[in-house]
Amino acid sequence: MAIILPELPYAYDALEPQFDAETMTLHHDKHHATYVANTNAALEKHPEIGENLEELLADVTKIPEDIRQTLINNGGGHLNHALFWELLSPEKQDVTPDVAQAIDDAFGSFDAFKEQFTAAATGRFGSGWAWLVVNKEGQLEITSTANQDTPISEGKKPILALDVWEHAYYLNYRNVRPNYIKAFFEIVNWKKVSELYQAAK
């Protein structure tokens, strides 16, 4: 067995105009595919550890040292992107009532949440991700990680993810990351967010 690159759940151009087809093609077929290939190459060196990336990245000390950083970077990259694709929707969706209530409880209002999430995504220096997670106490929390680090390694369960690596937006938005973040909120798959939230609580 090996880690497989998942197909996108929609066409490459399905998220236009927010996310253009060229970016989606490069992002999925090149960047994500490379993370998968590098992950498989690392796992082949240590077949004894298995292939459950969520379990491995939940406690990175259990990963053999010679492949640890490779798996943090590439295994994390695979998990992060596999989740990211599912969190995007070609059809505009309203926030589900359960998630809306949880966001109100945690942040005061949806606008306040959006502001804090945008700040986390804008403020991430260099490459990384912005996240809405369910923390160990079962509460919603906004966080960001560098590179391809995953909140799973901190015992948190991601329910919304935004890739802020330049390869995710530079062709369309150049260096204006805030415009990319604004576009992201127009294509969030809130049904998937709700599904993840219910499973994580």
UniProtKB/Swiss-Prot annotation:
It catalyses: 2 superoxide + 2 H(+) = H2O2 + O2. GO terms for molecular function: metal ion binding; superoxide dismutase activity. It holds the Pfam family Sod_Fe_C. InterPro entries: Mn/Fe_SOD, Mn/Fe_SOD_BS, Mn/Fe_SOD_C, Mn/Fe_SOD_N, Mn/Fe_SOD_N_sf, SOD_C_sf. One of its GO terms (cellular component) is extracellular region. Keywords: Manganese, Metal-binding, Oxidoreductase, Secreted. Gene3D superfamilies: Fe,Mn superoxide dismutase (SOD) domain (1.10.287.990), Iron/manganese superoxide dismutase, C-terminal domain (3.55.40.20). Disulfide bonds: none annotated. Its cofactor is Mn(2+). It is found in: Secreted. Transmembrane segments: none annotated. Its EC number is 1.15.1.1. Binds 1 Mn(2+) ion per subunit. It comes from the Bacteria. Mn(2+) binds at H27, H81, D163, H167. Destroys superoxide anion radicals which are normally produced within the cells and which are toxic to biological systems. Belongs to the iron/manganese superoxide dismutase family. Homodimer. This is Superoxide dismutase [Mn].
